[in-house]
Amino acid sequence: MSAKKSYLKVWRGLAGAAGSCARVFSKKSLARRDRRDQLPFALFLFGLVGAVFQWFLYGNWLSGIVSEYTVAAFFGGFSIVLPILLIGFSIWLFRNPQKTHDNIRVSIGLFMFSSFSAAFLHFSAGFPYPSSGIRILSTAGGIIGWLVGLPLTTLPSYLAKTVCIIFIVLSVSVISKTPISKIVRVIFRYAKWLFNSDSVKTSPNSSVSSSSEHQELTGRDMPDTAGDNRHDETVTVLSGTSLTGSPVSEYRGESSDYALPSLDILNSYPPVKHDDAENEKVITALSGVLRQFSVNARFSGFSRGPTVTQYELELGEGVKVERIIALTKNISYAVASDKVSILSPIPGKSAIGIEIPNKKRELVALGSVLQSIHPDAHPMTVGLGKDSSGGFVLTNLTTMPHLLVAGATGSGKSSFVNSMITSILLRAHPSQVRLVLIDPKRVELAIYSGVPHLITPIVTDPKKASEVLQWVVKEMERRYDDLASFGFRHIDDFNLAVRAKKIASDSRELTPYPYLLVIVDELADLMLVAAKDVEESIVRITQLARASGIHIVLATQRPSVNVVTGLIKANVPSRLAFAVSSLVDSRVILDRPGAEKLVGQGDGLFLPISAGKPIRIQSSWVTENEILRVVEYVKSQAHPDYYVLEVQNQGNIDSHIGDDMPLLLKATELVINSQLGSTSMLQRKLRVGFAKAGRLMDLMESMGIVGPGQGSKAREVLVTPQDLDSTLARISASVSDSKLD
């Protein structure tokens, strides 16, 4: 009896060791109680023994006899492939023992694939019957091939083989959960490549097409929800479309010598080793809460992300989801954390997710995220970071099409903006993407000054920021005029036609339009100075600019209703919320609670346009030294080509000043020297009434000397004392010119 127990102990130990090896590179950790390693270990051994006999001892008389009367007797010539299927299926079971439905599906698919492959071989060998002898059967399709093919013997051989091929394709669809249409497309594409290789080699799009089809086969088009198969995928693609689109080379204009920076310019960090003991303690504490309140539920596993670990809880029969949600405070008490979030259900699973912050957080380096982006991906593709299961999260800014970012101080909002801009600098040519950076805080984006992607110097003056946004609106209208004139609906189609020289203009030379990305680092400062003008421009851009290739990212520390107005929210469909201070702020940015429970430092909730629920991510991190290296590199490749932004002032200079000209000049000199735009000060110093002082202040506002009124506060003076003489000369000249007109 003791010997039997010893054998069982050794067997379990070997199975556990094999399972641990199979799970080394898995993104998902498994609790010990959920591991089922003995069955997959047995399959692995069968596959290993089969590989030895079928491959390495091929031609040996003993190997031939053993194979002939065992596996080859059942599957015939297909038995040479069976070791691969057995070993692959065993690794799948090692990693996913709790996915009962998926395991049954894969088992059925593999059996279908093996059976109909054997039947196809049996028809190819002339369909011998068992009476022909075991030796002939083992060289054809075996007993399985004969049984499966027997109902098809009434058909001609070529039709029977066609039916077998159809079922083989169907089995691949069952195994991979991929639509048959995509599998057929891939088969035809490779068949075309095989029989027409010369034409494919000369096609400039062949490599992109094959990579695109590979993404279709593996299911990496944009998933409807971020949770589908997240443990099986290392990359999650968000925001509506696949990232590949057109290759980078199609976006480059006539520019030539510019070379994109290598990703080696960014820092590399060693992978973090996780300790499952900490997660086991949490599961023990959570299980204690369930027992204490008599809740029939069990934990089926956990997924460790960089910031939080998601524990999967399967409910027993008759247990309401509301019971788990009602225990949130008790769970927080048990794990000693006030940042517990409950996801009910986990998208794509019949399980509840309990997200608990890790005691030791993982740094998500921007370099590692960008390494996961396909080289031919869209130039506006950026790496957001990692999700709660540890998979990389990517998004295409053109499909968002606009983004609203909010978070309190220290939440990681500015770090995300830096990562996004750095991603663009690393992956996009200046002729592909141009940037408009608006930084009212003056210090956040100053590091990017002089990069060739800028279309105008970094804007730090809120008053000028309003004018720049008006210029963006005019640029959008110019692009739409071209689209309408030449009959295109999107700027990409227009650019392709221009590069192919399919269209031309008599009045000017047509050139491709670059994407224009507008980034506002602090929306609240702009809304404080010129709320009406800023909101009007932002709403125009967000309503209409998508097809013209113009996209805007709005970031703010204060997601209050007077900053993020209803019109702005309605037209900016994608949201990214970092940690905020209150439930009210979370509802403003996401229209739901959740952001108030984030732990800060890059922990965020991303709600793309195509997702029903926000996805928890850890934003990627890039250091200031890395940014400096990237900026210095791109500045060494090209110089910025600034546009002249011609924007007409909202106010009109009143030329009918009459006898007030001397007073206006005195008022201008007084305001600029004192740097105080106060109407009451003009009343006292110039000894004029309130109406006259107010008129003088309005005239100075129309001339860009002072900013708009701010209630009882003094107006901001926009001209420095060093520019006093030139300003006085400009006033005199403008009034004289208007009189001549």
UniProtKB/Swiss-Prot annotation:
One of its GO terms (cellular component) is plasma membrane. Residues 200-212 have a biased composition (Low complexity). Residues 390-587 form the FtsK domain. Pfam families: FtsK_alpha, FtsK_gamma, FtsK_SpoIIIE. It is found in: Cell membrane. It is a multi-pass membrane protein. Keywords: ATP-binding, Cell cycle, Cell division, Cell membrane, Chromosome partition, DNA-binding, Membrane, Nucleotide-binding, Transmembrane, Transmembrane helix. Coiled coil: none annotated. ATP binds at G410, S411, G412, K413, S414, S415. InterPro entries: AAA+_ATPase, FtsK/SpoIIIE/SftA, FtsK_alpha, FtsK_dom, Ftsk_gamma, P-loop_NTPase, WH-like_DNA-bd_sf, WH_DNA-bd_sf. Residues 184-741 are cytoplasmic. GO terms for molecular function: ATP binding; ATP hydrolysis activity; DNA binding. Residues 213-232 have a biased composition (Basic and acidic residues). Consists of an N-terminal domain, which is sufficient for the localization to the septal ring and is required for cell division, followed by a linker domain, and a C-terminal domain, which forms the translocation motor involved in chromosome segregation. The C-terminal domain can be further subdivided into alpha, beta and gamma subdomains. The alpha and beta subdomains form the DNA pump, and the gamma subdomain is a regulatory subdomain. Belongs to the FtsK/SpoIIIE/SftA family. Homohexamer. Forms a ring that surrounds DNA. Essential cell division protein that coordinates cell division and chromosome segregation. The N-terminus is involved in assembly of the cell-division machinery. The C-terminus functions as a DNA motor that moves dsDNA in an ATP-dependent manner towards the dif recombination site, which is located within the replication terminus region. Required for activation of the Xer recombinase, allowing activation of chromosome unlinking by recombination. This is DNA translocase FtsK. It comes from Tropheryma whipplei (strain TW08/27) (Whipple's bacillus).
